[in-house]
Amino acid sequence: MWLLLTMASLISVLGTTHGLFGKLHPGSPEVTMNISQMITYWGYPNEEYEVVTEDGYILEVNRIPYGKKNSGNTGQRPVVFLQHGLLASATNWISNLPNNSLAFILADAGYDVWLGNSRGNTWARRNLYYSPDSVEFWAFSFDEMAKYDLPATIDFIVKKTGQKQLHYVGHSQGTTIGFIAFSTNPSLAKRIKTFYALAPVATVKYTKSLINKLRFVPQSLFKFIFGDKIFYPHNFFDQFLATEVCSREMLNLLCSNALFIICGFDSKNFNTSRLDVYLSHNPAGTSVQNMFHWTQAVKSGKFQAYDWGSPVQNRMHYDQSQPPYYNVTAMNVPIAVWNGGKDLLADPQDVGLLLPKLPNLIYHKEIPFYNHLDFIWAMDAPQEVYNDIVSMISEDKK
């Protein structure tokens, strides 16, 4: 870690003093902002709330109740809830310019937009009973996000808006917890008007992402390397890279390719001028247990709950010796799916296994040149994805 920091500092000094590695681009103001500040910076109204889950986690939730173009309309607006993916946060939906960020596009289209955060990320790192310094705080995976985080947040939104149903947009792990929650919790599923799944992930049997490589690491060694608390939080080093290293012309492309290695390549569709914003808010962290759960999923090729490591432990949690499988065929929520042909995480083969199991699939589009991150950051995402979502929600109002 210190070696990396030293190298990064050297690059910064050489770049500043001797002009190597190109000019340092002026930083984007959002680099040092929180979610509320990012929203209001662009002139949108913002409301910030804290949602407390049944097991005590405190999640920050943000609301953009209307857009810049329709503030005079005081009537009830359709509610759209956006849920981020793995190692991410609600900033994903507002990191581009307003005409390229889904949250702002939906608000300007006349919708009541809510942004969720999953436990353990930058904006959801508190608990009523446990300190984030404790092992107990980090004893969760996407199982608990589906069981506790989604119901608590959706219930809060329903009560706050007075509307019985909402539209759910999930990206990556945001689709995973949606599949689990809406197939195992029928009362919650009734509150979802339509599920819009971007880069959906259920099984990861064919994934080519870095998670695939981690599957070879035994649990004991995994914990020895990564510990048993937080995995990949955003820290000073990440912020330094974003503002002092990756903002230089010659290193900009190198840094963007580092992101692509994880999720797939599409450099032509990537707005490098926003790279400092992406890197200053990502990764947002999760638990080591959550990452190990994903490695279990790669190994098994199945969509199932976390394996606690022994039949005895599994019986304590599930009343059976093996972790239960998740059955997406039990989810009757109408769902529209978009996936990418070059997605290393949500591999097209895994998506191909998922689609026939969805009993109420209303739309599917595969974008051949899209990778995993294109769905939130691509310059042509409005044309390829977002405009379709807006149209579908609009049709649903009629």
Curated annotation (Swiss-Prot):
Residues at the catalytic site: S172, D343, H372
Keyword Protease: no
Domain AB hydrolase-1 residues, every copy: 78-377
Compartment(s): Secreted
An example Gene Ontology molecular-function term: malate dehydrogenase activity
GO cellular component, one term: mitochondrion
Residues with attached carbohydrate: N34, N99, N271, N327
Main location: secreted
Listed GO biological process terms: lipid catabolic process; malate metabolic process; triglyceride metabolic process
Family matches, as Gene3D superfamilies: alpha/beta hydrolase (3.40.50.1820)
InterPro entries: AB_hydrolase_1, AB_hydrolase_fold, Lipase_euk
Residues annotated as signal peptide: 1-19
Known catalytic reactions: a triacylglycerol + H2O = a diacylglycerol + a fatty acid + H(+); 1,2,3-tri-(9Z-octadecenoyl)-glycerol + H2O = 1,2-di-(9Z-octadecenoyl)-sn-glycerol + (9Z)-octadecenoate + H(+); 1,2,3-trioctanoylglycerol + H2O = 1,2-dioctanoyl-sn-glycerol + octanoate + H(+)
E.C. no: 3.1.1.3
Catalytic EC class: hydrolase
Family assignment from sequence similarity: Belongs to the AB hydrolase superfamily. Lipase family.
Its job: Catalyzes the hydrolysis of triacylglycerols to yield free fatty acids, diacylglycerol, monoacylglycerol, and glycerol. Shows a preferential hydrolysis at the sn-3 position of triacylglycerol.
PANTHER family: LYSOSOMAL ACID LIPASE-RELATED
UniProt protein name: Gastric triacylglycerol lipase
